Amino acid sequence: MNKIFKVIWNPATGNYTVTSETAKSRGKKSGRSKLLISALVAGGMLSSFGALANAGNDNGQGVDYGSGSAGDGWVAIGKGAKANTFMNTSGSSTAVGYDAIAEGQYSSAIGSKTHAIGGASMAFGVSAISEGDRSIALGASSYSLGQYSMALGRYSKALGKLSIAMGDSSKAEGANAIALGNATKATEIMSIALGDTANASKAYSMALGASSVASEENAIAIGAETEAAENATAIGNNAKAKGTNSMAMGFGSLADKVNTIALGNGSQALADNAIAIGQGNKADGVDAIALGNGSQSRGLNTIALGTASNATGDKSLALGSNSSANGINSVALGADSIADLDNTVSVGNSSLKRKIVNVKNGAIKSDSYDAINGSQLYAISDSVAKRLGGGAAVDVDDGTVTAPTYNLKNGSKNNVGAALAVLDENTLQWDQTKGKYSAAHGTSSPTASVITDVADGTISASSKDAVNGSQLKATNDDVEANTANIATNTSNIATNTANIATNTTNITNLTDSVGDLQADALLWNETKKAFSAAHGQDTTSKITNVKDADLTADSTDAVNGSQLKTTNDAVATNTTNIANNTSNIATNTTNISNLTETVTNLGEDALKWDKDNGVFTAAHGTETTSKITNVKDGDLTTGSTDAVNGSQLKTTNDAVATNTTNIATNTTNISNLTETVTNLGEDALKWDKDNGVFTAAHGNNTASKITNILDGTVTATSSDAINGSQLYDLSSNIATYFGGNASVNTDGVFTGPTYKIGETNYYNVGDALAAINSSFSTSLGDALLWDATAGKFSAKHGTNGDASVITDVADGEISDSSSDAVNGSQLHGVSSYVVDALGGGAEVNADGTITAPTYTIANADYDNVGDALNAIDTTLDDALLWDADAGENGAFSAAHGKDKTASVITNVANGAISAASSDAINGSQLYTTNKYIADALGGDAEVNADGTITAPTYTIANAEYNNVGDALDALDDNALLWDETANGGAGAYNASHDGKASIITNVANGSISEDSTDAVNGSQLNATNMMIEQNTQIINQLAGNTDATYIQENGAGINYVRTNDDGLAFNDASAQGVGATAIGYNSVAKGDSSVAIGQGSYSDVDTGIALGSSSVSSRVIAKGSRDTSITENGVVIGYDTTDGELLGALSIGDDGKYRQIINVADGSEAHDAVTVRQLQNAIGAVATTPTKYFHANSTEEDSLAVGTDSLAMGAKTIVNGDKGIGIGYGAYVDANALNGIAIGSNAQVIHVNSIAIGNGSTTTRGAQTNYTAYNMDAPQNSVGEFSVGSADGQRQITNVAAGSADTDAVNVGQLKVTDAQVSQNTQSITNLDNRVTNLDSRVTNIENGIGDIVTTGSTKYFKTNTDGVDASAQGKDSVAIGSGSIAAADNSVALGTGSVATEENTISVGSSTNQRRITNVAAGKNATDAVNVAQLKSSEAGGVRYDTKADGSIDYSNITLGGGNGGTTRISNVSAGVNNNDVVNYAQLKQSVQETKQYTDQRMVEMDNKLSKTESKLSGGIASAMAMTGLPQAYTPGASMASIGGGTYNGESAVALGVSMVSANGRWVYKLQGSTNSQGEYSAALGAGIQW
């Protein structure tokens, strides 16, 4: 049955005691202690009957960490426990456990030394700390710093907002970070680390798996020992994504570089942008892709697709299992294919071949590299036939091209070469060797021929026209007319000579420029009304082998180079605008010879007279030197007045001598020219007036070859002649196309093909094909069969007989014995060759046909060779042809038209100009020659539009002369001449004029040197005189007073510098060092850049200065530094000479010899010298303010800092201990007091790590180990002692802030709170019910006893009967009654023998070993009355008891309320529970539910936000997936597609871009996709597939 009881406080035992329900009790009053007692009572009611409520000491306290009065909702249980009271119950906190502190609002600190700082935070476990608002720290030494953070596990730390750290030593440092597992770390925002020692150290990083590492932002590492870099993803054990933006998926996969992807176990992507997908594959090159198990792509931009595929060459592609692309830019297609060579495509290997079928028509153009099929080759053959013209066609039976027929005036020809050979004989041809047209004519031994009827060519600087004989005759007449009056103008002759030399060189060089004759006729240009020598790509060309033309007034013959060379040579030796004098070259030669002699005689002495200025001008004469000697080369320009020296004149004379020789040669050449022109006509290309064409007939031959024809341009607009080699090449190409040993002989004869079918030979394609048809007539199935109707093999196939392509045809052998089929690429090559041969803009079309050429003949267009050749034959009317009647031997005639009038030959290239040249000369050459002559003459001579030269004008002494002779005569009168009698017979130039001395002006500055013999002019002499005058003044200024008396009195020297050496032996100063300066008697500056000033001064170190007599600078300043220090011997001044460049020392004395530096201004900069005044002021300042904020004023003994790293401040202060500090008068730190600090006058520290502060303070015990501290059960340790006084004098420590931590000092305010609490507790204890139990009976007994004592002890009502010891009342107001009774405590009562009262305000009726009953106690009524047993029994009757077991013993584990009848019972006035096993009241439950609801609501809101964000991100991801799913892809084989797509889902949107490609055979499909969504996230996908 149940026992009824109740729990009351027992002050004697200091705990709650179970008693009868009838027992009376008084409440324990202290702040919230009533609630606490109620809780304990409730807890007692829930515990077994008779147990003591010993859950812990009730030493907790409420603390208001804010301001104002305390609330009443706090709970603090445990010694040192503290709970913040706050202002109201809603903010109260709970602290349960030893030194537990619940500081934050709503906070809970449960466990020893737990500390809940944040609002609504929870700290569970030894030393757990929850500092962040609403944070949770669960586990020993766990720590939650961030707001809403959770730290679960020993030493776990959640430092960031909303962070979670779960696991031993786990650490979530960033906001929203999660660290789950032993020693995991999530360092920055949004980072996640899951697994033993996982580490996510950067923002948004994720490390999932044991020892996984996500070391950079946005890194994801999933799997044991994975690693991921910035924006990288590593999935799979030991997967490593080390490159930025890389991805590694699969066991041991490695993405080592930027933007790499490695997917598959052991896959490796080792270079930037590389992709490796498959088992054990490797992408080792930049931008490489390896797809397939064991595949490898090692080169730049390589792709390896397929098992064990290998792409090693840069930009190579290996597609198919075991395929290998080793060459650069190579492609290996198909399994086992090998591409070893650069820039190749392989579809097999040396033993495995594949066909390429279904080839579409390839583009056929100059830059096309498409494959060609059979139909295209046939189309090209047909096109060739059409372009050949002349009736050529494709044989419908055998596909060959029939020979063309070209009908020419000289017969029909069946190939282009033969037709061109006929045309070659009588046209003016290009000499390819000489690079010009050749007028040579004849077949066996062609000779030079005259070109007649040449119209006057334009004569200008830009003219390329041929000039005729009459034009050259006019030029020669001008030369003859200008010959007589050649004068002796030295300067002009010098210029003329130089130009002649240049002209001669140019003429000589022109001889070597003769080229080969081009294979084109010289044709009439209707637009320009002249023959045009344009050739090939050049607009102008030379005409060579031109026979000397007839040089008469009415001649229209073309002149050759030798004729013009003769003329030019004559012109070169004569000057222009010479008065009409001589009629023949012989006279000219005589005059030039006379001129040479005159110039030679005049040149020796010709210093010329300037009559306007009345002076000689210094133009120099000949080669010898005189008084005006070694004259520097004068400026040889038009305006120059410089004198010329002998070497310059020598050059001129040599040139004149050369001119004389050239003139004689030219005379001969001109004479020979007439004869040559007379004999020119024999070999010219003649005009056949009967047939209206130029004819190549020569001599007795009716037909002659025109050789040396350069390859003519073969285009639609070309009118070039075609030579034999071109025709031979064309025939050879056609023969090559025929095959069957078809060939072209060296004479152009075409040998037909021979085709062997079986054992029979066939000599044309038709018969050969017919034989082939017979051999296949019995073939069946899919064979290529002969179509008898069509007369050819038919590629028709299938029931409908559709035309089919014959594909995969390998390159057929091209040789005279080959019978291989050729493929499209070969046909394209043939077509290209044919197009090149045809020229005329012919092109190979995309379908293999050839676009017809266009040949322009006489401004008409022709689209085939036959028509073009016919046109050329017809247009020979406009060709430059051979005229057999011209001259004695015939000549090419430029006569044209019905009346055969002379015509201009235009576009004539520059002919060679030499003695042996027979080239035609064009107008520009003649103009150039005349221009050279005009330039050589000077005097503003110019070439007129008709080729003549205007006369020059020479101004000499202000008179004008129009020819060289008159000019030289004018010079002779006024020249500065050589006087052989002057200079004592040694000879000299004489400047006298008209017998009077004259000035020589315009003399250039002569060279002034020791070996110069140049004349100097007035300006130079004036400058010298001025310099002498200046130097005289400077010398006077420097020397000062040079009077002997002055020097004797003041010393020798210069202005302002004097030395008096009277009585001293001469001993000069010595500056021995480089850059050194020594001033003063016997001064020595030995060091480089050193200075010694003063008698006997000496400086022997570099840059040193010895200033003053006998001063010595010999010490080198070394770089170094030291600190200022204080020793027992005084202060050691520090220095630092390392902060700049060190120069030599300045010495003003010597060792043992000193000087004062007086009158020194106060220094102002860091390195200025200071004066005594400054030093005195500084010392004074040190005495008063030695250091800012530090002052000392004492005359006592100095301080001593003896210990290492010690500090001593204050008079007589001594610090002997290492690292000690002593501050104040007489402060002392003992040598044994390591780290001791003594602050204050006579403060002493004699213990390690101890501190004494204040006057006379002394440490007494120092550090202690395992000492017994007051009110502490466990032994304690200290590191040192802090003393603020001594045994003889103590100090108050005032203004102490309230302590909060376990080891903080507490102030009186805190102690008062404690005292108040103690007072309340004392009062409560005094009034407790259990202290007055049975008190009435006890008092009655006491009264009776007192009465007995009196009665027996002379007091009526008080008697004693004892011989024991006296009672002792020791406490104030105490009472001791009975033998040996002791009332030790204040206000205590010891009643009865041996009774002991040791507690204040108590009554004791016994001792701890001898107790007494208090009987006959009346029932208590008041709150402080004692209760008797009857009352207790009555109280117990309504109390709650523990249940009993079957054996009758108490069942402490069960309590049944309500009598066990099935009803319920309400327990009212239940105090709030504080311990784990305490019952909670409705208020606590309601508050807990509210807080749980609030926390749950908050977390749900947060979770909802996270879910909302997650939902948004997921929706964005789904939208991205939808956008990428919606991307269309290429589907046609060989096609590629770039696509864009969009997607939206649940309010989020995304856009995607994609690129896809289908392989040429349609089997492989590649896709690369990327997307971005409205959440700002990016995604990418890569795929490849094969279909069959």
From Swiss-Prot:
Signal peptide stretch: 1-53
Main localization of the protein described in the UniProt heading: other
Renumbered residue ranges of the record's region Translocator domain: 1500-1588
Location of the protein in the cell: Cell surface; Cell outer membrane
InterPro entries xrefs: Adhesin_Head_dom, Coiled_stalk_dom, ESPR, Pilin-like, Serralysin-like_metalloprot_C, YadA_C
One Pfam family it belongs to: ESPR
GO BP term, pick one: protein transport
Region spans: Surface exposed passenger domain: 54-1499
Triggers of expression: Expression is negatively regulated by H-NS.
Transmembrane segments: 1534-1544, 1548-1558, 1567-1573, 1577-1588
One GO location term (cellular component): cell surface
Record keywords, A-Z: Cell outer membrane, Membrane, Protein transport, Signal, Transmembrane, Transmembrane beta strand, Transport
Family: Belongs to the autotransporter-2 (AT-2) (TC 1.B.40) family.
Oligomeric form and interacting partners: Homotrimer.
Domains (record comment): The signal peptide, cleaved at the inner membrane, guides the autotransporter protein to the periplasmic space. Then, insertion of the C-terminal translocator domain in the outer membrane forms a hydrophilic pore for the translocation of the passenger domain to the bacterial cell surface.
Function noted in UniProt: Mediates aggregation, biofilm formation and adhesion to a range of extracellular matrix (ECM) proteins, such as fibronectin, fibrinogen, laminin and collagen types I, II, III, and V. Mediates adhesion to intestinal epithelial cells.
Protein name: Autotransporter adhesin EhaG
The species this protein was found in: Escherichia coli O157:H7
